[in-house]
UniProtKB/Swiss-Prot annotation:
It comes from Sus scrofa (Pig). It catalyses: ADP(in) + ATP(out) = ADP(out) + ATP(in); H(+)(in) = H(+)(out). The modification N-acetylthreonine is found at T2. This is ADP/ATP translocase 3. The lineage of its organism: Eukaryota, Metazoa, Chordata, Craniata, Vertebrata. The keyword Mitochondrion applies.
Amino acid sequence: MTEQAISFAKDFLAGGIAAAISKTAVAPIERVKLLLQVQHASKQIAADKQYKGIVDCIVRIPKEQGVLSFWRGNLANVIRYFPTQALNFAFKDKYKQIFLGGVDKHTQFWRYFAGNLASGGAAGATSLCFVYPLDFARTRLAADVGKSATEREFKGLGDCLVKITKSDGIRGLYQGFNVSVQGIIIYRAAYFGVYGTAKGMLPDPRNTHIVVSWMIAQTVTAVAGVFSYPFDTVRRRMMMQSGRKGADIMYKGTLDCWRKIFKDEGGKAFFKGAWSNVLRGMGGAFVLVLYDELKKVI
């Protein structure tokens, strides 16, 4: 093996272990967020049984479904990390070369900005093509609120993928794909814009204290997450449609989903669970710290 291959393998392993630990640690927050996002589109949660908010959700889940149910869908989330990272590594430089080759970020800012969005969107869409079914299964398993095996819609990851494929074909595993790609581009635009502005306001960006850099990264991640959150809500709602027939289908398509959520639930509905998403983002910062520590050991 070449030195570059060994270095990649070490990074891949350290990143995977760090991601598995952090994703498992924040899985309960992630499940609360998903339930608040999709409960309106769930066949299992009656209107009078819907969760009133984050605290109500945290209190009721262990009572109604057991403590371990906080980690429903976490395995799919952990597995998803490895192909995503490998694909990002494979495509990232290629897309940067295509969209940003020969562009000077100092003299051609807007071209650099557009190229960054295009390369990020293209890399994200390419990775999503391969890992989207895992993201889909993660959402459906987290939204499954039955306590016993007989009450639950799916027995596990494999059962979820097989049942939906039998019912709707491969297409069923890709519900909400288009809006997911749009969300990636919006997230990158917000992240890139806010981060660039924040860094530009610092007196000496290159010699910024690590705590200040961490706080900026946290703030930027939170702001970008809130900006792109409605797209995440719509895609999760679309995921809930797979496996349904006739009158059970709530939305005719993505545009109809946007319209109905706004009309029936109001603009606030697009941001259900957004606060728990911000808390989960702190777990992302933990990953970076953990990743650096693991690299020292491996």
